């Protein structure tokens, strides 16, 4: 192994959130599994138990776990994978100069310090969670997910109150491992979990589960380093990203990705076409199946959990984009369109799709079928090019399913609010209810610098309608490469959208955190308000800008209204007065008068 000797600062953000404790729930079918969650303690005066929330942050928020980035995370799934008896270790391909963009010397990012032999399926076997689910097998991954999705709840003794409109989704009161298996077997959900990513804590993407979010990271030819990208990944999952896509397009793609995967407890996705393009010096016309196939195997051996494949961009669809306002805005879509036009032939991604499936089933890499012809402006939303590609994605889904490969479908894009539901309805019908994974959509084009908001609106809507995972958009969208703070803003924005969608769909546990925070707000438990929020640091900071003293943390007002105009304080006074006089007496008095307010005097009484 050729490791360049140079020092790189390997410091990432660690430590728990305020008032939070990492807990682990054991399995029943698979007692060895330990499912992580976060408990948020509330003040003793509340008389309430801690609030349990979903936790995708991995060991980085666990004080009992020593973080050594150089060693990577514990390989918790390795024994699960090997125990199934259908994989074999092999030497694997060796790193080539082109894998890292021909970087050398000081420009070359060091290789990760530990190399494990990759695993692949034994001859004739499919090692995908879909294959196991179809065979009736409940894997440890499936039970892990069932426990995780229940947010620490035990099986409900009483039917929970359901309030929402699910638009045909069937969210159970309590998620069982068998329900997870059924959803995966049907293709309505996927478990992105490459057998070569044992560090991963299993999660699920599907319409009948909690809405998930993805954060994009990655270097470019202009900026960013390995240390920055690993920290971006850790930072993104700290604030709630469920998956991370490494969209690196500069040098050192292979080595940076290795560092990310070895330290990631969440699924990692990529667009293999980006690295393949780097291998041919950025010349799209020089791409070919052999280079792309080699790149797929390279990334599958590293442990990439899902591939975005733009196989739906077909030669005869390209003319449909000519009259668009913004043409083809997908990087992968534009690369393949350029290749198709130059060679005047069908895309090699489409022509070799069955071979791509064979690679994915040998490592359990899930498909994220790319929307290369998605609209890049609201003027182009729901046009012929977009929906023609969607039809092809539906065909490719059936091909992948026939080979036991897991599939989700990528969606737009830029779509005004009144056209969003049509996207969801068409996707469900065309793609057999495979999970939908959308970028926003952005609902207006007039707000550069605020596209996390324009897209958050669309994300909440399409998540409610049935999208399973939302790809975040940061304030830097269309403007530049996001930094650490942009990543946080994007993640928090999309956590809001996903949670709002869960509430609207009627998820049985979604409102627990809202109600706990509302009670804390009404009772002026300021610290509980901060700690129960999605971003305690910002909430506390905003409060302390005007009321910084510790005494203000118990005050029955904030700087918005002050002590005299606080509606909640006045409500407390009303309640206290009602209790003092007696609720029944007050009710009787109002009933006798028939009015809340004193009636006007009649002419007779005036005399």
UniProtKB/Swiss-Prot annotation:
Membrane-spanning parts: none
Catalytic activity: 5-amino-1-(5-phospho-beta-D-ribosyl)imidazole + S-adenosyl-L-methionine = 4-amino-2-methyl-5-(phosphooxymethyl)pyrimidine + CO + 5'-deoxyadenosine + formate + L-methionine + 3 H(+)
Cofactor note: Binds 1 [4Fe-4S] cluster per subunit. The cluster is coordinated with 3 cysteines and an exchangeable S-adenosyl-L-methionine.
Gene3D superfamilies linked: 6.10.250.620, Radical SAM ThiC family, central domain
Keyword Cytoplasm applies: no
Any matching Pfam family: ThiC-associated
Disulfide bonds: none
InterPro entries membership: ThiC, ThiC-associated_dom, ThiC/Bza_core_dom, ThiC/BzaA/B
Binding, substrate: 216, 245, 274, 310, 330-332, 371-374, 410, 437
Taxonomic superkingdom: Bacteria
GO terms, molecular function: 4 iron, 4 sulfur cluster binding; carbon-carbon lyase activity; zinc ion binding
Pathway: Cofactor biosynthesis; thiamine diphosphate biosynthesis
Binding site for Zn(2+): 414, 478
Enzyme class (EC, first level): lyase
EC number from the UniProt entry: 4.1.99.17
GO biological process entries: thiamine biosynthetic process; thiamine diphosphate biosynthetic process
Binding site for [4Fe-4S] cluster: 558, 561, 566
Keywords, alphabetical: 4Fe-4S, Iron, Iron-sulfur, Lyase, Metal-binding, S-adenosyl-L-methionine, Thiamine biosynthesis, Zinc
A GO cellular component entry from the record: cytosol
Cofactor(s) the protein needs: [4Fe-4S] cluster
Function as written in the Swiss-Prot or TrEMBL entry: Catalyzes the synthesis of the hydroxymethylpyrimidine phosphate (HMP-P) moiety of thiamine from aminoimidazole ribotide (AIR) in a radical S-adenosyl-L-methionine (SAM)-dependent reaction.
Family the UniProt entry places it in: Belongs to the ThiC family.
Subunit structure: Homodimer.
Name of the featured protein: Phosphomethylpyrimidine synthase
Organism from which the protein derives: Agrobacterium fabrum (strain C58 / ATCC 33970)
Primary gene name: thiC
């Amino acid at each position: 192994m050729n490791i360049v000797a140079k020092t790189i600062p390997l410091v990432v953000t660690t430590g728990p959130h305020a008032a939070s404790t990492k807990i682990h729930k054991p399995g029943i079918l698979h007692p060895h599994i330990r499912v992580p969650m976060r408990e948020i303690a509330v003040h003793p005066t509340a008389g309430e138990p801690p609030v349990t929330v979903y936790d995708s942050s991995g060991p980085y928020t666990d004080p009992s776990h020593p973080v050594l980035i150089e060693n990577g995370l514990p390989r918790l799934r390795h024994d699960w994978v090997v125990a199934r008896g259908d994989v074999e270790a092999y030497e694997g391909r060796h790193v080539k100069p082109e894998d890292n963009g021909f970087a050398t010397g000081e420009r070359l990012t060091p290789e990760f310090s530990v190399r494990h032999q990759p695993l692949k399926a034994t001859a004739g076997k499919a090692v995908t969670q879909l294959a196991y689910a179809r065979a009736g097998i409940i894997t440890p991954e499936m039970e892990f997910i069932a426990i995780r999705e229940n947010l620490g709840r035990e099986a409900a003794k009483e039917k929970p109150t359901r309030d929402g409109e699910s638009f045909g989704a069937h969210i159970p009161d309590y998620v069982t491992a068998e329900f997870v298996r059924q959803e995966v077997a049907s293709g309505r959900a996927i478990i992105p979990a490459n057998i070569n990513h044992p560090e991963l804590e299993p999660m699920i993407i599907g319409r009948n589960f909690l809405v998930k979010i993805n954060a994009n990271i990655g270097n470019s030819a202009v900026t960013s380093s390995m240390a920055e990208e690993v920290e971006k990944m850790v930072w993104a999952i700290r604030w709630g990203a469920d998956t991370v896509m490494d969209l690196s397009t500069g040098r050192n793609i292979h080595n940076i990705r290795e560092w990310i995967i070895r330290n990631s407890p969440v699924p990692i996705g990529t667009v293999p076409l980006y690295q393949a393009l780097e291998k041919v010096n950025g010349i799209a016309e020089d791409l070919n199946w052999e280079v792309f196939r080699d790149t797929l195997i390279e990334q599958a051996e590293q442990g990439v959990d899902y591939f975005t494949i733009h196989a739906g961009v077909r030669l005869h669809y390209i003319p449909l984009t000519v009259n668009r306002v913004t043409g083809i805005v997908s990087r992968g879509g534009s690369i393949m369109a350029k290749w198709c036009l130059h060679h005047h032939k069908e895309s090699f991604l489409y022509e070799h799709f069955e071979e791509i499936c064979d690679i994915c089933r040998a490592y359990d890499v899930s498909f994220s079928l790319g929307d290369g012809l998605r609209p890049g402006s609201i003027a182009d939303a729901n046009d012929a090019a977009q929906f023609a590609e969607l039809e092809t994605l539906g065909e490719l889904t059936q091909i992948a399913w026939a080979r036991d490969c897991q599939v989700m479908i990528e969606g737009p894009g830029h779509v005004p609010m009144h056209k969003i539901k049509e996207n969801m309805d068409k996707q469900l019908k065309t793609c057999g209810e495979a999970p939908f994974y959308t970028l926003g959509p952005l609902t207006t084009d007039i707000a550069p610098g605020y596209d996390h908001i324009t897209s958050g609106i669309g994300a909440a809507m399409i998540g409610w309608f049935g999208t399973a995972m939302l790809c975040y958009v940061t304030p830097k969208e269309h403007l530049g490469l996001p930094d650490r703070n942009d990543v946080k803003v994007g993640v928090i924005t999309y956590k809001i959208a996903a949670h709002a969608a869960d509430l609207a769909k009627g998820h049985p546990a979604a409102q627990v955190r809202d109600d706990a925070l509302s009670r804390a707000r009404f009772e002026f438990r300021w610290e509980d308000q901060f700690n129960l929020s999605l971003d305690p640091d910002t909430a506390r900071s905003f409060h302390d800008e005007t009321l910084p003293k510790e005494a203000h943390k118990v005050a029955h007002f904030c700087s918005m209204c002050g002590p005299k105009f606080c509606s909640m304080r006045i409500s407390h006074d009303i309640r206290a007065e009602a209790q003092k006089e007696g609720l029944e007496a007050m009710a009787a008095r109002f009933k006798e008068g028939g009015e809340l307010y004193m009636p006007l005097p009649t002419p007779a009484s005036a005399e």
